[in-house]
């Protein structure tokens, strides 16, 4: 005979507890620090990632048809529906999870989406576990894209610099450039200042000596890129583009 302190499976309730809901008092609005970071023009990427690290985000769940059957008059009738996390294609041919800072921003994207609050760490880990290399924050309004290096920093709660401001990246680029005498100067720029994935994350400007022939240029860039792409560099830099100038 089951006593009154057992559940339907006969497991005693004694010693068990419910996990506290960290977002029980959430008003559904954009967290203040995140709102301030998004309001900056242009956006300070380091400040944005820092704000996101301590922010609550909203994951949209979309109802999808589970099973269906034909009704008595030939119509298709839903037997069941499921809630699923959606992914979207990105301009750089990757995939991303759309997330939102507020219920209002989510409603503007899809009015019937169900908001599920989650820490930014959980969002970053969920994207990685599902094989998505980006998240898109507020795709119907701000439309800010975050790439893998930033997501890893958020997941680990680490300080992050965009690669054109990362001292290690600059030092490594200069070291590799010194091994290639035809390169006289090297400068790093933000390749994607609008965070819209329209260009590579890091723009490398190489000052080439006038003596470099067009035939040798392709070979030089291939060699430079191969040496540049160390394991550490790949962890810090999502993608690169080049701009060549005569120097």
Residue ranges and their predicted role:
Residues 1-247:
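An interfacial alpha-helical scaffold signature
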